[in-house]
């Protein structure tokens, strides 16, 4: 299983939100580029960066910070937050981003998102599908989790399978930033229904036991954020799982 340490950015600083709530923000006095370098030195091969300002505004804006992260590490770098157009994707790829994460746009503008797959290839595109569970069904939440939709996770996955959909980062927003364990059932079920899709688990990881369960379920990858900042375990320990 691939470990993706996460860096969430607001105004150039590392932060964590609780349940995606911009009013419940913890800011860490750490330089993002230094955090990235430390992750690489610990042995990480992947890193996940989110421009939360971009997610909220609907336009990626922290290019300079992202570029500094790129210059300080050679890990596979995936970046999301407000990616809405070709220009933004071009700029991110230009500064060395390996995979671009498409969030609410994948629900709001399917035609444009399909064009991204066509132009850049499925290996460059990660769909970030944030879900809330209602009556046992995962529905999509959009726009930095500030809106909820009536679209189900299944509907979106089916929409993009024909485009070669390869990577899906799926977050149960009720778990995010809570350190109370991810939604194991969600990843287990969807990994078995869609064996050709590489699912990245996100939200709620708070212990090494959580990682071991996800690994046993053959989850492709897991995003780890707050657990590292709060020293629940070290990145080395996570990588050794």
Swiss-Prot record:
Highest taxon of source: Bacteria
Catalysed reactions, as listed in the record: 1-(5-phospho-beta-D-ribosyl)-5-[(5-phospho-beta-D-ribosylamino)methylideneamino]imidazole-4-carboxamide = 5-[(5-phospho-1-deoxy-D-ribulos-1-ylimino)methylamino]-1-(5-phospho-beta-D-ribosyl)imidazole-4-carboxamide
Enzyme's top EC category: isomerase
Species this protein is from: Francisella philomiragia subsp. philomiragia (strain ATCC 25017 / CCUG 19701 / FSC 153 / O#319-036)
Enzyme Commission designation: 5.3.1.16
Keywords: Amino-acid biosynthesis, Cytoplasm, Histidine biosynthesis, Isomerase
Annotated pathway: Amino-acid biosynthesis; L-histidine biosynthesis; L-histidine from 5-phospho-alpha-D-ribose 1-diphosphate: step 4/9
Protein name: 1-(5-phosphoribosyl)-5-[(5-phosphoribosylamino)methylideneamino] imidazole-4-carboxamide isomerase
Protein family per UniProt: Belongs to the HisA/HisF family.
């Amino acid at each position: 299983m691939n470990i993706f340490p996460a860096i969430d950015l607001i105004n150039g600083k590392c932060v964590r939100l609780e349940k995606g709530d911009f009013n419940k923000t913890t800011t860490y006095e750490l330089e993002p580029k230094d955090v990235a370098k430390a992750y690489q030195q610990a042995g990480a091969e992947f890193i996940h960066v989110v421009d939360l300002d971009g997610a909220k505004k609907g336009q990626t804006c922290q290019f300079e910070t992202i570029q500094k992260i790129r210059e300080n590490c050679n890990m596979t770098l995936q970046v999301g937050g407000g990616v809405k157009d070709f220009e933004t994707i071009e700029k991110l790829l230009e500064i060395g981003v390996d995979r671009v994460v498409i969030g609410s746009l994948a629900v709001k503008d399917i035609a444009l998102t399909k064009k991204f797959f066509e132009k850049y290839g499925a290996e460059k595109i990660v769909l970030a599908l944030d879900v809330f569970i209602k009556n046992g069904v995962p529905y999509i939440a959009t726009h930095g989790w500030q809106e909820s939709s009536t679209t189900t996770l299944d509907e979106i996955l089916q929409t993009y399978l024909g485009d070669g959909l390869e990577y899906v980062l799926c977050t149960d927003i009720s778990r995010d930033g809570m350190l109370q364990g991810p939604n194991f059932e969600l990843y287990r079920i969807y990994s078995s229904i869609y064996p050709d899709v590489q699912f990245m688990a996100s939200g709620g990881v708070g212990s090494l036991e959580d990682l071991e369960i996800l690994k046993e379920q053959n989850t492709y990858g897991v995003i780890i954020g707050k657990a590292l900042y709060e020293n629940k375990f070290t990145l080395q320990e996570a990588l050794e799982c």
